[in-house]
């Protein structure tokens, strides 16, 4: 099966080229996706786009809500096509693909959550729309301008989130899709066009693709005109973004991270196992927040292990795995054999839907992902802390939730960036941080308009007449 995906330039779908010389292909097993080769005209149109988005925030959020209502409709053609593409090309199960589409609708339709996102990260939901008085100044946040998003394919929703952040801050979005997921950003942009092809939000979007090998001169030209770059992916992708971005702009890096789960002597073993299994299974451990290790403290360890296996089997039915190709199956088998040879205890599903490897803390051979988890029985939190690493550890899920209150300071000081209840690793709560930052703050420029000299300050209750102060040598008179 072959699929053609056209570029979208400034909210308009480009005509797919007829010549094979102007087309590039991405293979997905027996299937292929064909995309245009980026050309000078497209790059020029992207760079020349200079329409200021003067919409109020409520206009933007209402538009996103309207788009989200379409995604909520299970008969919406874009949604149906998107689900089919995730299954056919990316190997998603029906349940996984449907859940991805459901989350897109949830995010777009959560008007309150979008308002709160802006308020929490920028300080006020009005700060993008008007000048706000703050002490002795007025302040307003303006968009950086051209935001270039280098997306990854392991977590489709990360691309949606990246785009929405730029839209909420009124930036132009130049989206470079991933070779492993050329579908999500394209489907989202097409749904904007369906609602209103002339809407400023629609017109601010461009969705393209380029390879990092070969001639990247046009890609470099786009990068050199960026006002901010949002880079997702592995070390190579992050390094490429840093290398080709202008030296004076901000590169927001969402690079590779690891996450794990702490189970602290639970009373409810079933709930503990359910939460841990969810955090292992969601996205088949492809996400930075996915649990790859479980540290169990307390008694009833064997009972917990059996409950965990039971819940991994449950998730194999309610959220079936992505299809493994030949190499992935071989890697799974190899890790199993390596661990057995090393004397570790291994439980593995006959269909490779999950694997549990028991080892001491710090003993970890290879990690094939795909719902493979290392289970460590430890005595106390001190045996876990060495495996929390700054800039490397993202999410630590904890059960019971109350146990996190005991450990959160220790975990944070060691470098943990996010602490959640087990079973909640995929839901980024409003008000929280992402990889140690507030991303919206880095997508805007804060401009201050400061009050005039006759405005008296709290500590200096006279007009600020600096020339007179110098002439009369009275500066120290006004020092509080």
UniProtKB/Swiss-Prot annotation:
Pathway: Lipid metabolism; fatty acid reduction for biolumincescence
Keywords of the record: Luminescence, NADP, Oxidoreductase
E.C. code: 1.2.1.50
Keyword Oxidoreductase: yes
Disulphides: none
Catalytic activity: a long-chain fatty aldehyde + NADP(+) + CoA = a long-chain fatty acyl-CoA + NADPH + H(+)
Family that this chain belongs to: Belongs to the LuxC family.
Protein name: Long-chain acyl-protein thioester reductase
Lineage of the species this protein comes from: Bacteria, Pseudomonadati, Pseudomonadota, Gammaproteobacteria, Enterobacterales
């Amino acid at each position: 099966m072959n699929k053609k995906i056209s570029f979208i330039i400034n909210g308009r779908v480009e005509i797919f080229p007829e010549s094979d010389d102007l087309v590039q292909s991405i293979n997905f097993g027996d299937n292929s996706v064909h995309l245009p080769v980026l050309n000078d005209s497209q790059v020029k149109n992207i760079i020349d786009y200079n329409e200021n988005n003067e919409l109020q925030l409520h206009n933007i959020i209402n538009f996103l809500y309207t788009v989200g209502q379409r995604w909520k409709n299970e008969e919406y053609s874009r949604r149906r096509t998107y689900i089919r593409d995730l299954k056919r090309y990316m190997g998603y199960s029906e349940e996984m693909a449907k859940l991805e589409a459901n989350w897109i609708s949830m995010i777009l339709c959560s008007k309150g959550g979008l308002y709160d996102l802006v308020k929490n990260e920028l300080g006020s939901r009005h700060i993008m729309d008007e000048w706000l008085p703050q002490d002795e100044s007025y302040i307003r946040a303006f968009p950086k301008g051209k935001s270039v998003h280098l997306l990854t394919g392991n977590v489709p929703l990360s691309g949606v989130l990246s785009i929405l952040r730029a839209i909420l801050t009124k930036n132009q979005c130049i989206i470079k899709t991933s070779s492993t997921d050329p579908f999500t950003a394209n489907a989202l942009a097409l749904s904007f066009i369906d609602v209103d092809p002339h809407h400023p939000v629609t017109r601010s979007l461009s969705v393209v693709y380029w390879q990092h090998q070969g001639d990247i001169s046009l890609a470099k030209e786009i990068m050199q005109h960026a006002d901010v770059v949002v880079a997702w992916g592995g070390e190579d992708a992050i390094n490429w973004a840093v290398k080709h971005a202008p030296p004076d702009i901000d590169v927001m890096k969402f690079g590779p991270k690891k996450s794990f789960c702490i189970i602290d002597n639970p009373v409810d073993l079933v709930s503990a196992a359910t939460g841990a299994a969810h955090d292992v299974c969601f996205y088949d451990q492809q996400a930075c927040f996915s649990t790859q290790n479980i540290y169990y403290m307390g008694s009833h360890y064997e009972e917990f292990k059996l409950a965990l296996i039971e819940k991994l089997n449950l998730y194999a039915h309610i959220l079936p795995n992505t299809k493994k190709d030949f190499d992935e199956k071989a890697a799974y088998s190899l890790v199993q054999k390596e661990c057995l040879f090393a004397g570790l205890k291994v439980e593995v599903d006959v269909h490779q839907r999950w694997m549990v490897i028991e080892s001491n803390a710090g003993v970890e051979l290879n990690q094939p992902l795909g719902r493979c988890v290392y289970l460590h029985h430890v005595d106390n939190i001190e045996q876990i802390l060495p495996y929390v690493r700054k800039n490397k550890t993202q999410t630590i899920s904890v059960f019971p939730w109350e146990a996190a209150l005991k450990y959160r300071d220790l975990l944070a000081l060691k470098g943990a960036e996010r602490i959640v209840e087990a079973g909640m690793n995929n839901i980024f709560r409003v008000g929280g941080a992402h990889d140690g930052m507030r991303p919206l703050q880095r997508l805007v420029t804060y401009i201050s308009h400061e009050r005039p000299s006759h405005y008296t300050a709290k500590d200096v209750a006279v007009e600020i007449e600096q020339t007179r102060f110098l002439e009369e040598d009275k500066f120290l008179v006004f020092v509080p």
